[in-house]
Amino acid sequence: MPDAVTTTPRRRRRSRLVSVLAAILVLVLALLLSYALWTVYENTLTTAALDQGPLITATTSGASALSTTAARALKAYGGEAVWKDAVTVESTVTVGGLLFQLKGVNIPAHAKITVDVQRPHTVIDPVDEAGDTGVLDGFSVTILSRSGAILEQRADARDHLQNASVSTHWDRLNLVYFLGYAFWGYYSLPHQLLRTDIAWTELGDGLLQADFGPNLAVHSRIQRFWFDRKTGLLRRNDYTPVAASRDTKAAHVIFEHGISNGIPYPSKRRVKMSLGQYGWVLPFPDFITIDVERWQLH
């Protein structure tokens, strides 16, 4: 009987030890799996991973004197002559991600999005399953019926999104404003390098910082852009969305480019969160996914 009493605590200790070792093993395997996923996560995102050189003395330039990085990027996307005279970009896209699940609203798959390259003006068709159309014009948004009748309108759309919680639900006008200004910024980026009302600062080879000022509908006034040092193509864009709290740090990662009439365009975009401002990017979740199925510059 004493032997049985003595054996039971020993078994319990062994059982606890086995449980602890199993937990450690699971943790190690999880870390190894995370590391494996991280290594195949091609666009992850430190200065070294983006193949950037060391920071240099910051230089600010206007359209008349493009920095080395800006000139390389503009050339990569078709050149100054193409974008100086560009009028519109037409596209077909599918948008998804955790953000729109939290907001409770999204546009249908394969929606047509058209932006005016020269100014913040975007048309989203359709904006919902009813077939209505959403229009962004500066800071105002409108929803039109199929016949063109005005269904809803909001002149101060940015104020309705300013520093909201990520879980705050949106109405259709919120959605149109967010996607409208976002896609205008994404599609017109090469032309933005030529604008005199945007202050571009080269922080390092392949790294630009933009000050958009207070009068343009964009994610945030200050943004950073990482471009490939060899190809000049965009790889990452960091900002704090106007639709999120001030401590939100978004990293917009370009995974793939397509080609339309000889002009490259980002075709697979993923918006993720970064660990601190301009830091490492969390591989998941995807807050926003953008798959561009068709893209045409006019």
Regions found by a protein language model. Name each.
Residues M1-T7:
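N-terminal intrinsically disordered, acidic low-complexity segments at the extreme N-terminus
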Residues L29-A48:
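Membrane-interface motif at the C-terminal end of an N-terminal transmembrane signal
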Residues E42-K75:
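N-terminal pre-domain segments of enzymes
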Residues P54-T57, S61, K75-Q153, T196-A199:
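N-terminal mature ectodomain segment of secretory-pathway/periplasmic proteins
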Residues S61-T68, S145-L216, A244-S245:
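Flexible, processing/modification-adjacent segments and terminal tails
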Residues A130-T142, R146-D171, A217, Y278-L297:
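Catalytic loop of the DD-peptidase/beta-lactamase superfamily, centered on the K-T-G motif
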Residues G204-H298:
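Gly/Pro-enriched, hydrophobic low-complexity segments
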